[in-house]
Regions:
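Active-site/ligand-binding surface loops and adjacent short beta/alpha elements
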Residues: 56, 159-161, 168-249
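Acidic/His-leaning functional-site neighborhoods
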Residues: 17, 92-106, 213-284
Length: 306
């Protein structure tokens, strides 16, 4: 039987379809991908190649919960739910259910002079999370960075528990994060056990200084905010300063120096993850969003480079 000249399913890169964005001819490139609806490349980011899978959560959307859920178990509306243990070493379910899903492009760069794109994914009900959500990720390239808008709409007929995050790795141009200066303006940090699960909370004055050999995998709360409601994390190198900002929908920030990553990625970039809720929120209920039928949650964050 003869084969068609044009394949029914043309080959696609492991990272999915590529959406190349740029704010004008001289703007820095921003690349969103259909695998997980995340970011592969962008100003101020330590990204990954088109032919790679995103390791360490790199650039991925984390929903309907971020970070770890203890034993993958939680109760909602009087019903016990069990999710697959996606991180067996810690007996936790980590970073949600949409990281490896194929997202659909609903608005491409051709309609925005190359500046923006919108991807969406319908999360279907499944064992452990029997709710239906419409997730939308919108990316806009700027002359000095980019903006991300993430939203979730409850398509089910019952209230749905929800949390979100995103997992960019920042780079200030240093070979290792050790040589960068870091400022996190926060009033508390969670204490955790050896599984990375919360055991308590303590007051801090954030973090301000050279990263050096510090091993960070910390969840910061009580975030200081400017008059615009934004919290910021600043990473400074000799050649550039990278600022990640997050609006009030993001109540927590996870900062991770990447010490557990593969050697070629270890401490090359600093993960700064905007989180709507802390780890284990599906079980604890802390800062968990309750989406009523038809209700939409929206959070915005972005990066500027100077």
């Amino acid at each position: 039987m003869s084969q068609p000249d044009t394949p029914l399913y043309p080959p696609i890169a492991p990272s999915g379809g590529q959406l190349h964005l740029r704010a004008g001819a001289d703007g820095p490139p921003l690349v969103a991908v259909t695998l997980g609806g995340g970011l592969r490349e962008g100003p101020g980011l330590e990204g990954y190649a088109e032919g790679e899978l995103p390791s360490g959560g790199r650039g991925q959307v984390l929903a309907p919960w971020p970070n770890r859920l203890r034993d993958g178990h939680y109760a909602w509306a009087g019903v016990e739910h069990q999710l697959p243990l996606s991180e067996p070493a810690t007996s936790t379910a980590i970073h949600g259910l949409v990281r490896w899903a194929e997202w659909q492009v609903t608005a491409g760069p051709e309609g925005t002079e190359g500046r923006g794109a919108v991807l969406e994914h319908v999360l279907a009900p499944q064992p452990g999370y029997p709710f239906r959500l419409l997730l939308v990720a919108a990316y806009t390239a700027l002359a000095d960075g980019f903006t991300t808008t993430l939203s979730a709409t409850n398509l089910a007929a019952v209230p749905a528990p929800f949390g979100a995050g995103q997992h960019p790795y920042l780079s200030a141009g240093t070979a290792l994060v050790d040589d960068a200066e870091l400022t996190v303006a926060a009033g508390t940090v969670l204490t955790t056990d050896d599984r990375g699960l919360p055991t308590g909370e303590q007051s801090v004055h954030g973090y301000d200084g050279r990263v050096g050999d510090a091993r960070l995998d910390d969840t910061y709360g009580a975030l200081a905010r400017g008059s615009d409601g934004r919290a910021t994390v600043v990473l400074r190198g000799p050649e550039r300063t990278v600022t990640l900002w997050a609006d009030e929908a993001w109540r927590w920030l996870q900062v991770f120096t990447g010490d557990t990553l593969a050697p070629d990625r270890r401490r090359r970039g600093l993960a700064v993850e905007p989180l709507s809720c802390p780890p284990d929120a599906l079980a604890s209920g802390r800062d968990l969003v309750v989406l009523e039928p038809g209700e939409t949650w929206t959070g915005q964050w972005g990066v500027t480079v100077a």
